[in-house]
Curated annotation (Swiss-Prot):
It is found in: Cytoplasm. The gene is murE. Catalyzes the addition of meso-diaminopimelic acid to the nucleotide precursor UDP-N-acetylmuramoyl-L-alanyl-D-glutamate (UMAG) in the biosynthesis of bacterial cell-wall peptidoglycan. HAMAP family: MurE. One of its GO terms (biological process) is cell wall organization. Carboxylation is probably crucial for Mg(2+) binding and, consequently, for the gamma-phosphate positioning of ATP. UDP-N-acetyl-alpha-D-muramoyl-L-alanyl-D-glutamate binds at S29, T153, T154, S180, Q186, R188. Its EC number is 6.3.2.13. Meso-2,6-diaminopimelate binds at R384, D408, N409, P410, R411, G459, E463. Its cofactor is Mg(2+). This is UDP-N-acetylmuramoyl-L-alanyl-D-glutamate--2,6-diaminopimelate ligase. ATP binds at G111, T112, N113, G114, K115, T116, S117. GO terms for cellular component: cytoplasm.
Length: 495
């Protein structure tokens, strides 16, 4: 059943709002239902006022707009001008949906890498601890293991509060949420109450949007100044994380996590072991320790598990409970997913690594697992940070024995141009194999691999599409790799 509320409760200072009852707040005119208030604010390319006719035709009972109106666009009688409307949307949506984030334990996770893994592992841990958990992030929104894709790492502000209201109504007790730098910069999480704010790391990404690392870091830091944050879990092995920790407001509980034994750490991992069966370490909190043995692969998954441990510690779980549940957590789709490795086949790993730091971490982690060659397949997205393309080439050439460059969501950009940008970063580009057809590149990489080799397919992870010229074509790295491995097995059987 849809909610309804007098608009005056959301805009008590606006006289024109007194006699209107609304059933929803909507920014996209195509999503308006009868009884909704249509919210028109300035976008990156066009003002929402340009879509008033569509919103009214679909049954909008109120038009709220942020002045000034763009030149040449007429404002209909009865439309309500609200100065600073965008900045008020979070509080309005929070109130309209009955303050949903205050009814659940809310954990917001920000950082360049590790957000999705941390969020999904935390929700899985809560689930195993008997907590009805939910997530919001790159993989979608929903109760644990019931995700619905949204197309955003962090949904737009009105959609986000609606999602949180639905999660509350569905019985969620705790929500783990990815909070992107774009979301923080654009006010998408305004009005959300966070119990725990989490920082994973800060490395190069999204500089096409933020301009430089300083502004990128400033956007991430906004999460920790958010209303009502009770605790902050911060990776103090990261220099920016250390700055965050020491800059926290008084009254915020500080939980530093470290794999390097940092003196500011409250939660640490010691005595690490890595092999093809997974990872192991001692979880140390204060003077106490407990063993963790996990089937997850990769050194960076120690960081992810340690971050989850920090959150659970901040929520007052005991060391014994934390260590036990960490040992039960399973891999996440598209994050260091292992395929093959049996009957003389190479091991194939599918991972979402699409930044220089993430690619470097994955390759470095796999190098400790491999006894043969390390073969890397990667590309770079179109219409995104061009500066990282050559950097990823440097990382791949330095850490892999064989490199294949391919397409990875070229979008509206020329794929040959993207490849040229990548190749510019190689010292010996003549040794790099280029195959823009991603399926063919995956097949070629697996085809040249032998038993003992590891093939990394990097960049897309969980994604089930290849975006070319505005069209998302069905594509899944895991499915392609499994088909190639199955064909290899069939050939061996015939022989």
């Amino acid at each position: 059943m849809r909610r309804s509320m007098p608009l005056a409760q959301l805009l008590p200072d606006i006289p024109q709002a007194r006699d209107v009852v609304i059933s929803g707040l909507v920014m996209d005119s195509r999503e308006v239902q009868p009884g909704d208030a249509f919210v028109a604010v300035a976008g990156f390319g066009v003002h929402g006022l340009c879509f008033i006719e569509d919103a009214c035709a679909r049954g909008a009972v109120a038009i709220l707009f942020e002045p000034p109106a763009p030149q040449g666009v007429s404002v209909p009688d009865g439309a309500i001008a609200v100065h600073g409307l965008r900045a008020r949307l979070g509080a309005m949506a929070d109130r309209f949906h009955g303050h949903p984030s205050q009814a659940m334990t809310m954990v917001g996770v920000t950082g360049t890498n590790g957000k999705t893994s941390t969020v999904q592992l935390l929700a899985q841990a809560w689930h195993r601890l008997g907590v009805r958990s939910a997530t919001c992030g790159t993989l979608g929104v929903g109760l644990y293991d019931q995700l619905v894709p949204t197309g955003f790492t962090t949904p737009l502000v009105l959609q986000l509060h609606q999602c949180l209201g639905q999660l509350r109504d569905d019985g969620a007790q705790a929500v783990a949420m990815e909070v992107s730098s774009h979301a923080l910069d654009q006010g998408r999480v305004d009005g959300v109450h966070y119990d725990v704010a989490v920082f994973t790391n800060l490395t190069r990404d999204h500089l096409d949007y933020h301009g430089d690392m300083e502004h990128y870091g400033e956007a991430k830091a906004r999460l920790f100044a958010h209303q009502d944050v009770q605790a902050a879990v911060i990776n103090v092995d990261d220099l920016f994380g250390l700055r965050l920790l020491h800059g926290l407001a008084n009254g915020v509980r500080r939980v530093g996590v470290s794999v390097c034994g940092h003196t500011d750490a409250d939660v640490m991992a010691q005595h690490l072991s890595l092999n093809l069966q997974g990872i192991g370490f001692d979880l140390v909190i204060g003077a106490d320790r407990a063993p963790v043995r996990s089937p997850l692969m990769g050194r960076f998954n120690v960081d992810n598990l340690l971050t989850v441990a920090g959150v659970l510690y901040a929520l007052d779980y005991a060391l014994s409970e934390i260590a036990a549940v960490l040992s039960t957590l399973r891999p996440i789709h598209g994050r260091m997913n292992r395929l093959g490795g049996q009957d003389g086949q190479p091991v194939v790993v599918v991972d979402y690594a699409h930044t220089p730091d993430a690619l470097g971490q994955v390759l470095s982690s796999l190098s400790s697992h491999v006894c043969g060659r390390l073969i890397c397949v990667f590309g770079c997205g179109g219409e995104r940070d061009r500066g990282k393309r050559s950097q990823m080439a440097v990382i791949a050439e330095s850490n892999a024995d064989v490199v294949l460059v391919t397409d990875d969501n070229p979008r509206g950009e020329d794929g040959d141009g993207i490849v040229a940008d990548i190749l510019a970063g190689f010292v010996r580009p003549n040794l790099v194999k280029v195959q823009r057809d991603r399926s063919a590149a995956i097949a070629a990489a697996i085809g040249i691999a032998s038993a003992g080799d590891v093939v990394l397919i990097a960049g897309k992870g969980h994604e089930r599409y290849q975006e070319v010229a505005g069209v998302r074509h069905p594509f899944d790295d895991t499915e392609v790799a499994m088909r190639v491995l199955a064909a290899m097995s069939a050939q061996e059987t015939v022989r």
